[in-house]
């Protein structure tokens, strides 16, 4: 139903109800004009938005398990209703919304959460609201409505209208209004489960039928906490927009905002237009900067980092849908995850010829400039991705076995969907040779993209058979490289050092460029010369995943 305009009397009624917060304290909303400080109300006892409640928690404590009843979890900060109520739904209408607003000029980076709650035990309704700076617990209000559902809807819809200048019933056509909050599009089909229930289910399942090495691999790549910790490191706010909840459309909108930022950087517009584009991006993709001013994205490196963030978000969305699906049945959860990958993973015998060749390839192509770690090969899995063999361009010559590295959080997406090219809406900046799939003939060059550390020293490297065909050889980066192919099939960025062709061997029909690396004599007379080769193809059907390596990174002591 359409929200009715509040008359003055009704407005006073809503205001009076808003004072009935669950701890008996009043709460003030952040409705002050930009650039002005919000007044703080005097309170008895702990402040709703006080020092203890408003303190940014340590990253290690930020990964929460949400208790889900229905399609959306009750905000864990709503102590009065947690475990006693659920978010009210009518069909596909879920009365739960997270709003976000970033304004760099005034150091605004804030959220507003609204939920209509229904008690589990009886038909009592309430409206929970919480607001504050991203990364902070903020302030809150709990409005009780007894059994009056229409009153609860009216409060919910009016607050949504006040904060966004959009009507709740028209939210499918939501349009951001300057100076108002934006609505984060959430995927209510992707839900987190109660961890204790999940563990209980796992104990009831039969034992996994998978090889123990495959089980350990799946535990490594399907670890939700690892995914959250990685996103927190990239400043993404997992509290305001939990992983698995952002829709594909919301991520796409983030790419569109980055495209605007790219246009500003290329045009040399570092004023208002760039700031507004950054405001839009941070509003669409929530970031936690604590009390710091959200930084303006000014350089291609900073833009590239945000592109990587969205790529990781996309892969994590895929991973969480796979991990959280199909809890029913008599299969062990790991067996279900494996089946949903549609990708066979067969561990190689450490004494086999394939394992020994791959181990030699790994160690002999560790680049001399990557001296801060060594790599130990723990396991190798032969990969057979469903449909890749049939689609692969066998007709193209010059097939090489090349390296590709990525964060642990990305591997469910890679194994289930294959290596992919960046979407059309992504900015081209950040891709040295355009939107393609990148490979190396030096193992450590790709290993650097695993982003391993001393505390998290396990990573995965992929060896793919790549149909390079005829390469277009370039001496320097060019984001428009795909347009320069002119009938050729791939791009090769020429490096100063590379494995010598004298050491190349053949494995299962593919050339393996064994090391060690030697000087190629390549020099770019017009500028920077790449240290090592890069190989880029622009179509997934030129790639066939062959081996997945589980690596231990051994970081050298700094003193």
Curated annotation (Swiss-Prot):
Q: What is the lineage of its organism?
A: Eukaryota, Metazoa, Chordata, Craniata, Vertebrata
Q: Tell me what reaction this enzyme catalyses.
A: NAD(+) + (ADP-D-ribosyl)n-acceptor = nicotinamide + (ADP-D-ribosyl)n+1-acceptor + H(+); L-seryl-[protein] + NAD(+) = O-(ADP-D-ribosyl)-L-seryl-[protein] + nicotinamide + H(+); L-aspartyl-[protein] + NAD(+) = 4-O-(ADP-D-ribosyl)-L-aspartyl-[protein] + nicotinamide; L-glutamyl-[protein] + NAD(+) = 5-O-(ADP-D-ribosyl)-L-glutamyl-[protein] + nicotinamide
The EC class name is: transferase
Listed GO cellular component terms?
cytosol; nucleolus; nucleoplasm; nucleus; site of DNA damage
- What is the annotated quaternary arrangement, including any partners? Component of a base excision repair (BER) complex, containing at least XRCC1, PARP1, POLB and LRIG3. Homo- and heterodimer with PARP1. Interacts (via the PARP catalytic domain) with HPF1. Interacts with core nucleosomes.
Positions of region (Disordered): 1-58
List locations, semicolon-separated: Nucleus; Chromosome
> Which residue numbers does the motif Nuclear localization signal cover?
19-20, 33-39
**Effect recorded for residue 37 to R:** Decreases levels of mono-ADP-ribosylation without loss of enzyme activity
What PANTHER family does the record point to? DNA LIGASE (PTHR10459), POLY [ADP-RIBOSE] POLYMERASE 2 (PTHR10459:SF60)
Principal location listed in the UniProt entry: nucleus
Q: What is this protein called?
A: Poly [ADP-ribose] polymerase 2
Q: Which residues bind NAD(+)?
A: 404-406, 413, 420, 446
Q: Which UniProt keywords apply?
A: Acetylation, ADP-ribosylation, Allosteric enzyme, Chromosome, DNA damage, DNA repair, DNA-binding, Glycosyltransferase, NAD, Nucleotidyltransferase, Nucleus, Phosphoprotein, Transferase
């Amino acid at each position: 139903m359409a929200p009715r305009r509040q008359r003055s009397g009704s407005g006073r009624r809503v205001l009076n109800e808003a004072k009935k917060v669950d701890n008996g304290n009043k709460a003030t909303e952040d409705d002050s004009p930009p650039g002005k400080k919000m007044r703080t109300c005097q309170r008895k006892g702990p402040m709703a938005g006080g020092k203890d409640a408003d303190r940014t928690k340590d990253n290690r404590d930020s990964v929460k398990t949400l208790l889900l009843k229905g399609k959306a979890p009750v905000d864990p900060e709503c102590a009065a209703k947690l475990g006693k109520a659920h978010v009210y739904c009518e069909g596909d209408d879920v009365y739960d919304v997270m709003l976000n607003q970033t304004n760099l000029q005034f150091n605004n980076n804030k959220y507003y959460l609204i939920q209509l709650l229904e008690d589990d035990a009886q038909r009592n309704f309430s409206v929970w609201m919480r607001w504050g700076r991203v990364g902070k617990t903020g302030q809150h209000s709990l409005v009780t409505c007894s059994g009056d559902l229409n009153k609860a809807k009216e409060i919910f819809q009016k607050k949504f209208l006040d904060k966004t200048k959009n009507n709740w019933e028209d939210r499918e056509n939501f349009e951001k209004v300057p100076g108002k909050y934006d609505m984060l599009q959430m995927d209510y089909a992707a839900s987190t489960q109660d961890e204790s229930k999940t563990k209980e289910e796992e104990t009831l399942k039969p034992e996994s039928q998978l090889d123990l090495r495959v089980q350990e691999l799946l535990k490594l790549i399907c670890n939700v906490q690892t995914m959250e910790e990685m996103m927190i490191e990239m400043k993404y706010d997992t509290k305001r927009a939990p992983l698995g909840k952002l829709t594909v459309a919301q991520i796409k909108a983030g790419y569109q905002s980055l495209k605007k930022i790219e246009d500003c950087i290329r045009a040399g517009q570092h004023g208002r237009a760039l700031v507004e584009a950054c405001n839009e991006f941070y509003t669409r993709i929530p970031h936690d900067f604590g009390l710091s001013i959200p930084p303006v994205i000014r350089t291609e490196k900073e833009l590239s980092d945000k592109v990587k963030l969205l790529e990781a978000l996309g892969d994590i969305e895929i991973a969480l849908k796979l991990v959280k699906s199909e809890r029913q049945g008599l299969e062990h959860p790991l067996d279900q995850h494996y089946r949903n990958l549609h990708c066979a993973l067969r561990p190689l015998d450490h004494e086999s010829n394939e394992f020994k060749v791959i181990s030699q390839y790994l160690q002999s192509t560790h680049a001399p400039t990557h001296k801060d770690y060594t790599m130990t090969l723990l396991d190798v899995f032969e990969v057979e991705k469903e449909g890749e063999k049939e689609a692969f361009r066998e007709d193209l010559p010059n097939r090489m076995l090349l390296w590709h590295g990525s964060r642990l959080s990305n591997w469910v997406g890679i194994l289930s969907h294959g290596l992919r090219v960046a979407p059309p809406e992504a900015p081209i900046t950040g891709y040295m040779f355009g939107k393609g799939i990148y490979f190396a003939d030096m193992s450590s060059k790709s290993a650097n993209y695993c982003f391993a550390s001393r505390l998290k020293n396990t990573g995965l490297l992929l060896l793919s058979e790549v149909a390079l065909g005829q390469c277009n050889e370039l001496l320097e980066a060019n984001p428009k490289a795909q347009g320069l192919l002119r009938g050729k099939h791939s791009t090769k960025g020429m490096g100063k050092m590379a494995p010598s062709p004298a050491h190349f061997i053949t494995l299962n029909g593919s050339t393996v460029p064994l090391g060690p690396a030697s000087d190629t004599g390549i020099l770019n007379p017009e500028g920077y010369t790449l240290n090592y080769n890069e190989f880029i193809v622009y179509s997934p059907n030129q790639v066939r995943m062959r081996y997945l390596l589980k690596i231990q990174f051994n970081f050298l002591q700094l003193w």
